[in-house]
Amino acid sequence: MRGSCERSGEDEEQKEEAMVACGRLSGVPEAEQGPEANWDSDLETEGTDGLGELVRDTLYLRSCRAHSVVPISCFLRQGSAQELNLRHRGLGPQGARALASSLSSNPYVKRLDLRDNGLCGAGAEALAGALSKSSSIHDVDLSENQLGVAGAQALCAALTVNQAMRKMQLSGNGLEEQAAQHLAELLLAHTDLKSLDLSYNQLNDQAGETLGPALAENTGLTELNVSWNHLRGPGAVAFARGLEANIFLKVLDISYNGFGDPGASAVGEALKANNVLEELNMSNNRISAMGALSLGLGLRVNQTLRILVVSRNPMRSEGCFGLLKSVQDNPASALELLDFSDIQVNAEFDGLASSVRGILPELCIKTGACRVEYKKELLPVFRSALPASVPK
């Protein structure tokens, strides 16, 4: 045993019976268990409720046998932990089915990390059944699992039933416009979901037209990441209009899409009306100087935005100047970080930056290859925009 503990004779006898049952289910004959199996086994758990954990382990092993999969020893060790990390374990759909039967009755796990397990739609459907019944799990990472539209549909339906979920990560799952309809339904129905990560998918302009109205009506989400998708054209504009009407979202990452000048103009209009958003990342969105000027119209009046990242956009020094001039013209601006990384600026911009710092001494302006420090803590989605030396 990994740690010493004292139990009554009755508890020890019950534990021994449970251990033998586990051995049978895992294919190990009782005769081969040996007395030491009770003391040094991968199935053993620690704590005063060890017997209950063994019962749950037995259920998991029975399910593994039924689905012809090898049990995951780290799950048996972490079964009573609040955070269950099973990323990169190669579970597949069958492994997900075996796991789901145990999770549905597990009262301990609050955060579940199943990133990169090849779950596919079938595995997501199995887990959705467990999530619809769990009252304890509120944070799930299912990124990089090839979930597709079938997986998205199952998960969104499950979360609509169970309002316990607070954070869901679905990055890198090949989600396209068909999945956007189910995601939109989730945004409309789930009022307690606070954080949603849809980055690195294939959400296109049609998806933007679907998600935009849902974002406008959503009444709970505070952090949304849709970076590295294909939002452009009318879809980007529709999405931005959803932001304009939303009154809950505080953090939005739309970097590495194709908003372009029309999308930037729509975001500018949104910033005129939105008095809640605090952090916005629009890096690499094909925004020219003209789009930057349109975006700046929102900065002239907005009083809540603290962080704006527009790095790697072809807006040149003229666009950067226009944005900064808009900030200068807004004495009520709350901006603390304005990031123009990888955009070269001229002396005229530098002069304006000096003047703005006199008005807003707390404002950090980042340009070109210049290394500056922004000392206040950022949410994880924005930390990549800062130099490695900046405290996280």
From Swiss-Prot:
<feature type="repeat" description="LRR 7">
    <location>
        <begin position="276"/>
        <end position="297"/>
    </location>
</feature>
<dbReference type="InterPro" id="IPR052394">
    <property type="entry name" value="LRR-containing"/>
</dbReference>
<dbReference type="InterPro" id="IPR001611">
    <property type="entry name" value="Leu-rich_rpt"/>
</dbReference>
<feature type="repeat" description="LRR 6">
    <location>
        <begin position="248"/>
        <end position="269"/>
    </location>
</feature>
<keyword id="KW-0433">Leucine-rich repeat</keyword>
<feature type="repeat" description="LRR 2">
    <location>
        <begin position="134"/>
        <end position="157"/>
    </location>
</feature>
<feature type="region of interest" description="Disordered">
    <location>
        <begin position="24"/>
        <end position="46"/>
    </location>
</feature>
<dbReference type="InterPro" id="IPR032675">
    <property type="entry name" value="LRR_dom_sf"/>
</dbReference>
<feature type="repeat" description="LRR 3">
    <location>
        <begin position="162"/>
        <end position="185"/>
    </location>
</feature>
<protein>
    <recommendedName>
        <fullName>Leucine-rich repeat-containing protein 74B</fullName>
    </recommendedName>
</protein>
<keyword id="KW-0677">Repeat</keyword>
<feature type="repeat" description="LRR 5">
    <location>
        <begin position="220"/>
        <end position="241"/>
    </location>
</feature>
<feature type="repeat" description="LRR 1">
    <location>
        <begin position="106"/>
        <end position="129"/>
    </location>
</feature>
<feature type="repeat" description="LRR 9">
    <location>
        <begin position="334"/>
        <end position="356"/>
    </location>
</feature>
<dbReference type="Pfam" id="PF13516">
    <property type="entry name" value="LRR_6"/>
</dbReference>
<feature type="repeat" description="LRR 4">
    <location>
        <begin position="192"/>
        <end position="213"/>
    </location>
</feature>
<feature type="repeat" description="LRR 8">
    <location>
        <begin position="304"/>
        <end position="325"/>
    </location>
</feature>
